[in-house]
Amino acid sequence: MSNQERQERPEKDPDLRSTEVTEGYEKAPHRAMFRAMGYDDEDLSSPMIGVANPAADITPCNVHLDDVADAAYDGIDDTEGMPIEFGTITISDAISMGTEGMKASLISREIIADSVELVTFGERMDGIVTIGGCDKNMPGMMMAAIRTDLPSVFLYGGSIMPGEHDGREVTIQNVFEGVGAVADGEMSEGELDEMERHACPGAGSCGGMFTANTMASISEALGFAPLGSASPPAEHESRYEEARRAGELAVEVVQERRSPSDFLTRESFENAIALQVAVGGSTNAVLHLLALAAEAGIDLDIETFNEISARTPKIADLQPGGERVMNDLHEVGGVPVVLRALNDAGLLHGDALTVTGNTIAEELEQIDPPTVEDLDVDYLNTVEDPIHERGAIRILSGNLAPDGAVIKITGEDHLHHEGPVRVFEQEEGAMEYVQEGHVESGDVICIRNEGPQGGPGMREMLGVTSAVAGQGHAEDVALFTDGRFSGATRGFSIGHVAPEAFVGGPIAALEDGDTITIDIDDHELSVDLTEDEMQQRLEGHDPEPTYDSGVLAKYHNDFGSAANGAVTNPGAKWD
């Protein structure tokens, strides 16, 4: 073809970053590569929008995400965008739970964030739809969006429906607790086998207000996701409508140059915390919100969770503390119902902006979700007549946790416990102790060397806490650790004790028989040792890393304190 016959492509916005790989005769090789994948002139002249997809067959949370990503892709394509789908990793928290492999979970948050950042940076993308399924997908994707500051929309893959067993609804939480019930003689192995076969009927993230659903709900409160997008179940048609909507919105936010830094503020994070404590959300959200704030350079102290929990009541009775799941919330209007209740009571910053360009109050006005009073359901209470006067999250301190520790209150508010401690160096020893039937009412169990650096990776202890709960000790046995707990954990379980044992935190000084005081009302976690006694015990404390090569050794060196979100990005900022 002669020069005069050269085909003219539509003009592209010169301010788009993707012009670096699509415009000018010098980029002919780049365009040739795109054409090999089926992109045409119209595509190459459009905003290039990534679809970050962690689809995988290793967890029901993510097994359907190719279909979700396809719907988002179509939304971009039909709105004059150029969609480019790419993959990243996921770890199944539930399947790795109770094994050495659980150390990979929190590390995967960092790898997801890094990998999405790298692809969008390397390919000069203009915007991104980030998709999440299993627990660490959500914070990893949002961290990447904040770090790149690309116009971004977060899209949740949706939760699993509850199963049915013996005439009642069951979830994975019931199966984990069934393990403890079998060990205690309260359930037969045959009964557990039947429950196992019915608890997880299809695709989607764990159905209660566990970590995945907590972070998905928080994505709405932060402004990262459109209101109402978190609750549709994974296999409902409405989930794919939300995915298409996310793709369409992604084109809009690129065209409007609306980046996370344009709407994320401290008030956004305070809204997220208010929602978390009102619905009884996962303790993991404390860690992840601190990490997101650090990425955004927003000053968010762990004590803020206490301040907001003190003024925000718990109004949703969902698993693990209650019986209902995310689908129940979806059927009455989803997360916006809770947000409206909080906003109407003056407990939200209604003027906080969202990814749509509107404030959260304006979005609520447009959606007009029902009031809790109008719904009259047994799992949502009004702010004036709450389930608990205070929100579900407490931050404890004291001489055992000078930098803080986290507990979620799922039952009785006024918890006080004092007694001798039984110390375990890793999760496995504690699990064996519980499963062999040694645990008794009034026990205090400490599991240490499971922190961000010491594990490394802050394993979740759902196996241990579920075994304790399954034996009937959810409220009368206390457990604390420098590791984490699953969002499905309930009971007297305290995590994120900081500083951790590996770096010489006070938890490293404990010995069997030391008297521990836990007082939730006073936010106290302490031991009957003086500062001098603890320092004497810690003399010569210089533990070797658990791993000397590979990814676990790398992240042992990179992780920061749980009190700051256990971030690894050296550019992340905190006060």
Curated annotation (Swiss-Prot):
**UniProt keyword Magnesium present:** yes
Q: What does this protein need as cofactor?
A: [2Fe-2S] cluster; Mg(2+)
Record keywords: 2Fe-2S, Amino-acid biosynthesis, Branched-chain amino acid biosynthesis, Iron, Iron-sulfur, Lyase, Magnesium, Metal-binding
One of the entry's Gene Ontology molecular-function terms is: 2 iron, 2 sulfur cluster binding
Q: Kindly state what the record says about how the cofactor is bound.
A: Binds 1 [2Fe-2S] cluster per subunit. This cluster acts as a Lewis acid cofactor.
- Which Pfam family, an example, fits this chain? ILV_EDD_C
Query: Hey, which pathway is this one from?
Result: Amino-acid biosynthesis; L-isoleucine biosynthesis; L-isoleucine from 2-oxobutanoate: step 3/4; Amino-acid biosynthesis; L-valine biosynthesis; L-valine from pyruvate: step 3/4
Chain residues that bind [2Fe-2S] cluster: C61, C134, C206
Q: Which family does it belong to?
A: Belongs to the IlvD/Edd family.
Q: What quaternary arrangement does the UniProt entry report?
A: Homodimer.
NCBIfam families (alphabetical): ilvD (TIGR00110), PRK00911.1 (NF002068)
Protein name (record): Dihydroxy-acid dehydratase
Q: Read off the lineage from the record.
A: Archaea, Methanobacteriati, Methanobacteriota, Stenosarchaea group, Halobacteria
